[in-house]
Amino acid sequence: SYVNNQKNNVLNDKPILGVYHVSNQGSSDMYCKGSLMLHTLRNLIDNDELWFSIIKGISNNFKYQIVDGQDIIDYINLVSDKDFSIFFKQYLEFKDIPEFQYSIVKDGMNKTLVYRWEAIDKFDMPLLINIGQEDFWIYPSNSFSELDLGAFDINDFNIRTDLFYINTKKL
């Protein structure tokens, strides 16, 4: 898709947000990386009706006002009824994007997913994975977790990187 092709243009050389109150030249990453961050957020919200009401609500509620990024984050948190503060901190204030680290441990026919986020402290973004025809959410944190996946063909395992702007690393 158009959004995912933008990944090729991101250098991850600087955070999206620059240093305030100084003349700070940002990276061109801010455009593509910002677009990919919003694509990730839309998939985390996982409700297009809510997503588009948030986008329209930002326009309607903040017209004729001077706002900053925190005003927008607070609004998204309020309307979505979820706290995305750590998500925004990771994507806006740090040059590196979260890395999903994982391994699949085989025990006979059964397989166990061992996984975590390599990201800022308390980063706990849910993630969709796919086995065969089925997508399901997992809930990584900064600490390793294990999930029994049962028996399946290892070639059917897929991390939905088309929906999230992340790096992955198989350990």
Language-model regions: role of each:
Residues 84-85, 100, 104-161:
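Beta-strand-rich binding/interaction modules
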Residues 162-171:
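Edge beta-strands of extracellular beta-sandwich domains
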Residues 1-118:
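Hydrophobic alpha-helical and helix-loop surface patches within well-folded domains
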